[in-house]
């Protein structure tokens, strides 16, 4: 699948994929001046990129494992819908214990193209605390209920 994109100026770094089999496309910080993200704080980082996302797809912004593990920087959950045609910004959270500097050209996130299945919710009236919506072997056990 080929996706059209634009750089907002000539200095914006082109997204890269380290290996042909990688799911994500790495994107870079497009900053004039470095910024510092203090522990337990966030910053919105511009990429200088716009993407033409086809109908029936979305871009999901994901962590890069290296900055999450080495620097304590996590990407805030992002879904970029096909109708959005503005610049992509990355919401970075510093969950570590030391300030982190972000500079122009730093790899900050990866974009993954995901097919979207449109759904329409159907409200079921009644006492859902007594009657499950569906019957399954798993049941209604929540976090950690299947072991591990």
Task: Annotate the PLM regions.
Residues 1-148:
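DUTPase catalytic domain/fold
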């Amino acid at each position: 699948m080929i996706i059209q994109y634009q750089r907002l100026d000539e200095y914006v770094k082109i997204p890269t994929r380290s290996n042909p089999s990688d799911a994500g496309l790495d994107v870079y910080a497009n900053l004039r001046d470095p910024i510092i993200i203090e522990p337990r704080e966030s910053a919105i980082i511009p990429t200088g990129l716009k993407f033409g996302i086809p109908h029936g797809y979305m871009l999901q912004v994901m962590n890069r494992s290296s900055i999450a593990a080495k620097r304590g920087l996590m990407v805030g959950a992002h879904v970029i819908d096909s109708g959005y045609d503005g610049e992509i910004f990355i919401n970075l959270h510093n969950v570590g214990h030391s300030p982190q500097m972000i500079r122009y050209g730093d790899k900050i996130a990866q974009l993954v193209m995901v097919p979207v299945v449109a759904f329409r919710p159907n409200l079921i009236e009644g006492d859902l605390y007594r009657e499950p919506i569906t019957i399954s072997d798993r049941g209604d056990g929540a976090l950690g209920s299947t072991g591990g």
